[in-house]
């Protein structure tokens, strides 16, 4: 599990356009999360940064923490890399960092399109709202697809995963999963 207090603090700093300070980490979510860790016999931590933060900054006994990085087996994509096309981005739209990522992509896409006029980016994500679909623009090659019925197929056929995630915590599953398919990100 990623540390929610860290993600919340990063989100707040991002939205206020300020640099994250150590004092920003101390909030009600922090207190509940640290209390939960201290009540448990063992907490699994998937991020080396977060493991070090807990031990070094917050003096959590490393004997009640276990670093367990996410990993996965390499998968054989359906399509050879030379046959793949399009940029993709993927993420559930109920998760604020994923919505902010799409907004970042919309800003960046015009510059990418100038360099690669034939390029398209396909945006996948469950729970896409009307405001998400309003960003769809076929002329610009900015295509909102909505929910991916088969993520493996999407990753197997794409050329590059783009994920300018402005804030968050933990390890990004989409980055790890894309690597399993040999998809640069």
Show which residues each predicted segment covers:
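Acidic donor-binding loop of glycosyltransferase active sites
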Residues: 41, 156-170, 181-185
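Conserved catalytic-core segment of nucleotide-activated headgroup transferases in glycan assembly
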Residues: 15, 38-44, 49-157
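A conditional alpha-helix N-cap/helix-loop micro-motif detector
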Residues: 25-26, 102, 144, 168
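Acceptor-binding helix/loop patch of EC 2.4 sugar-transfer enzymes
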Residues: 2-27, 82, 92
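Short alpha-helical segment that forms part of, or immediately flanks, the ligand-binding pocket
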Residues: 152, 173-181
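Membrane-proximal helix-turn-helix segments that form the acceptor-binding/catalytic region
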Residues: 20-43
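Short, flexible loop segments at the rims of nucleotide/cofactor-binding pockets, characterized by
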Residues: 19-26, 141, 162-165
